Amino acid sequence: MSGLAACAKALSARGVKVALLGKCNSGWLIYVYRPAMLAARLASPDTRGFLRSMGYTNQSAWLETLRAHLKTNPTFPHEIGVFLDYPLSDVKAFIEHAGADYCCAGIWKAYSNPISAQRTFALYRKCREVYMACYRRGLSISRLAVAA
């Protein structure tokens, strides 16, 4: 069993899915997510409308569409931000402004609500630090993933 398959199996028991999206410059793009949380995130009418406008017509095949966009788009498909739980307004603004004119940057480029964005960036940074420290101490991926 490959390392990725073993990781996917271990995470599956915790309600976490692993999807191989495609090859990128230096390796592979892997999307790790909780299906119920992704469905809730993408359920808003505004998000569904945005994804439809970007060519995501079949809700049950959105990850396959994202995978196809990664293969065929000469530039990175920036709508991936909604799959990563970036604010929809920031994803749209990033596309509209071609990545320029943002008010602050961290995990993503924020175009509105800089205080909220910076708070989220700090939370993500702290979470990453804690999890990396636990991993370095020998905790397995399956132990690090909490059941939802």
Task: Give, region by region, the residue ranges found by the protein language model.
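A glycine-rich, hydrophobic loop/mini-helix early in the fold
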Residues: 1-60
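Generic secondary-structure signature for well-ordered alpha-helical cores
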Residues: 12, 96, 100, 129-133
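Long, compositionally biased
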Residues: 19, 107-148
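Short glycine-enriched loop/turn motifs at secondary-structure junctions
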Residues: 23-24, 74-76
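Short linear loop/turn motifs
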Residues: 25-26, 64-66, 95-98, 105-112
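Short capping loops/turns at secondary-structure boundaries
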Residues: 59, 73, 80-88, 110-113, ...
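Helix-hairpin-helix/helix-loop-helix acidic hairpins
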Residues: 60-74
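Hydrophobic/aromatic-rich, well-ordered segments within soluble, folded domains that form packed cores
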Residues: 77-103
